[in-house]
């Protein structure tokens, strides 16, 4: 599940996991969980998250590769917010190929104006540190500079499923389900 900040990755990922009866792995949630810990690494992670930045390629890749390696051959999982950089997308694809695991990358597409509106709305509800207005601008830049390349990689591999995220939560979910032929 990929998309701009506020595109609904978490919400749609949870709904898809429920429909499939499987687990969901959220890169953002995992990193926020790690940032709540104690010690040097937790502080470094917290600093990056609070600034709206991305952790190093190797770090993010290590986390989702570890999850992939722990799955049984018939297990299904939804990854939400993974592969935010080209190197991560390539590592995911290489790992999935080695494990003989087919996959689809779902891209929830929304424009930048909608990102700002949704995050402003979410900020009052969830209170995430990475939803501060200056941080949102940086997250949009990070998306444009990095995540867009990962999405293009998946498009060229023929595994990208693009869905408009501009509708009600239920209608977007229905589009995701239809796009995946579920």
Per-region residue spans from a language model:
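Glycine-rich phosphate-binding loop of ATP-dependent small-molecule kinases
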Residues: 1-182
């Amino acid at each position: 599940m990929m998309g701009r900040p506020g595109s609904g990755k978490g919400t749609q990922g949870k709904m898809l996991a429920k429909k499939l009866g499987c687990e969901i792995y959220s890169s953002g949630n995992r990193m926020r969980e790690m940032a709540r810990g104690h010690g040097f690494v937790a502080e470094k992670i917290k600093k990056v998250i609070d600034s709206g930045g991305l952790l190093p390629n190797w770090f993010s890749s290590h986390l989702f590769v570890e999850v992939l390696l722990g799955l049984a051959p018939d297990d299904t999982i939804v990854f939400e917010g993974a592969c935010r950089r080209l190197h991560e997308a390539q590592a995911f694809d290489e790992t999935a190929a080695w494990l003989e695991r087919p996959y689809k990358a779902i891209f929830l597409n929304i424009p930048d104006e909608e990102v700002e509106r949704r995050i402003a709305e979410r900020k009052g509800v969830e209170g995430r540190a990475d939803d501060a207005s200056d941080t949102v601008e940086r997250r949009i830049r990070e998306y444009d500079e990095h995540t867009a390349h990962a999405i293009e990689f998946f498009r060229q591999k023929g595994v990208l499923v693009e869905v408009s995220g501009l509708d009600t939560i239920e209608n977007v979910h229905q589009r995701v389900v239809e796009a995946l032929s579920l």
